[in-house]
Amino acid sequence: MAMQGTVLIDGVAEGKLLRLVEPISFWGGVDPATSRLTDPRHPQHGVAIAGTVLALAAMRGSSSSSAIMLELLARGIAPAALLFGEPDAILSLGVIVGREMGYPVIPVLALAASEQARLPDCVLRIARGGAISAA
């Protein structure tokens, strides 16, 4: 299995795929102290996103979501990588600000929802340039 994402922020990562089945807002939907999904209406409520390759077919939310991403990076509990169905400037901004503050940089890729659906439930490896493969 090999796929090519569109690079929004380049980097390398490895982590278990976590495909969110519904959109979520990081502001109010993700606990920045634990990385767990806290929105009680979300079907994956309670799941931790730390260290995962987080696939988000669609986003919902607030411009404050970038601050939550920044907190996750600062605490070392951010996802290993982000895969957006469509480019998302808000969460990407959190990663960019984190980079400027010296926090670890995670890769951020755009990968169509139809392509995300084809990803196997396994540990994925993201290479520089956006190559996605099973680890």
Predicted regions and their residues:
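Catalytic or ion-coupling anion/metal-binding cores of large enzyme and transporter domains
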Residues: 1-17
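Feature captures the catalytic cores and cofactor-binding loops of soluble hydro-lyases/lyases
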Residues: 7-9, 19-128
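Phosphate/diphosphate-binding glycine-rich loops and adjacent basic-rich segments that engage nucleotide
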Residues: 129-135
